[in-house]
């Protein structure tokens, strides 16, 4: 990988948090560790992450609430639940809230790495599908437009993009 995938790792167990972050950094991930749900939400509001690893059972804001907020505020963020207190019910709830994957601790590092790569690939696919759909919606009116209308629309689109880039 050329550039590093940026991960937010949320766990209240200090030793586990340090260990998993160190292992992921050795595998060329950029890792930001936080030890509470509140810190996770705050960090995600300040930085752009591609993936979040979230523990479920934490004091204060629990992992399900973190998942709910992260998916609402950052729809492109893939969230993987990594918990030592898992159950079928919590896995179902997490999936319904938008979790990409649900893992139980202890977790094999190679399996976690595979899930991280798949989550990153899914994120890219979703963004491309979204951008393709957005472009189709922008260009659809041009299909039936006269040549002069097409030219005006393309000019407006070009000016709009230039304005967005200059901000």
Describe each region flagged by the PLM.
Residues 5, 35-39, 61-65:
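Acidic catalytic/metal-coordinating carboxylates
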Residues 28-35, 43:
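Short hydrophobic/Thr-rich beta-strand motif most characteristic of the beta2 strand and flanking loop
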Residues 11, 55, 83:
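Active-site residues of response regulator receiver
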Residues 58:
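Receiver (REC) domain active-site loop signature in two-component systems and cognate sites
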Residues 42, 64-76:
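Short amphipathic alpha-helix used as the core "switch/output" element in two-component signaling
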Residues 107-120:
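C-terminal output helix
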Residues 123-167:
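CheY-like receiver
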